[in-house]
A protein has these predicted regions:
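Conserved small/polar residues in nucleotide/adenosyl-binding loops
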Residues: 268-274
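Alpha-helical transmembrane segments within multi-pass membrane transporters and channels
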Residues: 46-107, 114, 261-266
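Short loop segments and helix-boundary regions at transmembrane helix junctions
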Residues: 14-23, 79-125, 178-190, 238-256
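Residue-level signature of the transmembrane alpha-helical core
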Residues: 30, 71-75, 106, 165, ...
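Transmembrane helix-bundle core of multi-pass membrane transporters
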Residues: 52, 56-57, 91-92, 100-181, ...
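Membrane-interfacial amphipathic/re-entrant helices at transmembrane-helix boundaries
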Residues: 1-6, 20, 34, 43-69, ...
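Hydrophobic alpha-helical segments embedded in the membrane of multi-pass proteins
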Residues: 4-9, 26-30, 221, 234-253
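Helix-loop-helix "hairpin" substructures at the membrane interface of multi-pass membrane proteins
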Residues: 153-233, 259-261
Length: 278
């Protein structure tokens, strides 16, 4: 279900602008790097500053509470969305989708480079208190399903994936309610249907894009937390965008609930051969 979290960000931006945001995976990486940086008190651009000025500063403080670090990371991702709109998107309104797609490819490389300069390229451990590992009670409960003398030792499901499923469902329900029952949500749907018609009735395209990219940045942060908790925060994390492509193909590029369905099918396909521990 962690693939669904990445796919949600793709769907939101594609619905609002018709653009496949190639940088969504890098968003998740950047959010995870920033969160670890806040948690550990790391000085941004420490390596660059120390090289230029001959200093040896690496940390502002010893640690930061997880809740505060997550809040600051969320603010950072929303600010990043605003900067992207101001510097990139506002100059590309009404351009061909291929131009916008190429812009997101360039954006991915730029963000990846900035993340490297800010926080370094070493693998980092991310821990926000989310439990992980196999569910022992499920294994014990399913041992009895096998016949006596068999080599079946119970069903294995990672607790982290259970948490990811719950969070993804909550996000989908929240986004569905937001888009259906709020004025801003209806404006977002209008922009998704027809940019020119939305502009003609006074809807600010730039405001909607900032909102969508901000929400997408928040979702990327959630995905980055989940993936970083599972496999560590490393630059290969940006490749999860490619792993989310089957989810988008199965669920649809404009369907928010489809991201959950596609993620469920993809996760089942990937884990079914190893779901039983023997």
């Amino acid at each position: 279900m962690m693939y669904s979290l990445v796919a949600l960000g793709f769907v939101l931006i594609f619905k609002a602008s018709g653009v496949f945001n190639f940088a969504q995976g890098v968003f998740a990486l950047f959010a995870a790097l920033t969160l670890v940086g806040y948690q550990t008190g790391q000085v941004p651009f420490a390596h660059l500053i120390n090289e230029l000025f001959g200093t040896n500063y690496h940390h502002w403080y010893a640690s930061m509470p997880n809740f505060l670090a997550i809040i600051l990371t969320m603010i950072t991702m929303i600010a990043l969305a605003w900067i992207i709109e101001r510097l990139v998107l506002k100059h590309l309104v009404n351009q061909d989708p291929i131009i916008l797609f190429m812009a997101t490819i360039g954006l991915a490389f730029v963000l990846e480079g900035i993340g490297d300069l800010m926080w370094g390229s070493d693998v980092k451990v991310l821990d926000v208190g989310i439990p992980s590992g196999g569910s022992e009670w499920l294994e014990q409960a399913t041992i009895g399903l096998a016949s006596e003398g068999s080599d079946y030792y119970g069903m294995y499901i990672d607790v982290l994936n259970v948490w990811a499923t719950v969070i993804a469902v909550i996000l989908v329900i929240s986004l569905a309610i937001f888009s259906q029952y709020t004025k801003t949500g209806r404006a977002l749907r209008a922009v998704a249907d027809d940019h020119q018609a939305a502009l003609s009735v006074g809807i600010s395209l730039r405001s909607i894009w900032v909102l969508v990219w901000g929400i997408s940045g928040f979702i990327a942060m959630v995905a980055g937390i989940m993936w970083g908790t599972e496999s560590g925060v490393q630059f290969s994390l940006s490749l999860i965008a490619l792993k989310a492509l089957p989810v988008l193909i199965l669920g649809g590029f404009t369907s928010i609930p489809g991201a959950i369905i596609g993620g469920s099918v993809s996760y089942t396909h990937l884990t079914l051969p190893t779901i039983y521990s023997v």
